[in-house]
Amino acid sequence: MTKLAIHGGNPIRVKPFPAYITVGKEEKKAVCEVIDSGCLSKYLGIWHEQFNGGEQVQALEKEWSEYFGVKHAIAVNSCTSGIYCAVGATGIEPNEEVIVSPYTMSASATAPLVYNAIPVFADIEENYYCLDPEDVERKITSKTRAIIIVDIFGQPYDVHAINSIAKKYN
């Protein structure tokens, strides 16, 4: 293996990732409509017609589920909440394993812990810093229940390789 850049080796990336605007006019308009309504959140913590949020949230979930052809979609406030929901939705049991990246926000590793499962770190690949499919496959055991995949810096993971591995091992 060559010397890491931090130890004097050649860096993989010499040009910084580009900065870009992530909020467009449509998003600004939608946010202003919610703010102008005078009610930022219609989520209620009791069973009620608005239990799952206001009109905008319910419209988003409906549109999302129709677009992807799925029965349900749940909007959450952050990727952290989404990861926690996704791990819980697997029906994971205590002591089962979840393969996670060592190079991501801590929620990827803590979400399995919430369900008394075990996070198992797989290595990242050197160009995009996402999970290395070969190491993911090496880490799979009879206790593996899920793989948490995250994109880093807007760079996607190797979708085809990871999905093939996930299907292979169910």
Report each predicted region and the residues it spans:
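PLP-dependent aminotransferase-like
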Residues: 88-170
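Conserved PLP-binding active-site segment in aminotransferase class I/II-type PLP enzymes
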Residues: 1-80, 85-88, 149
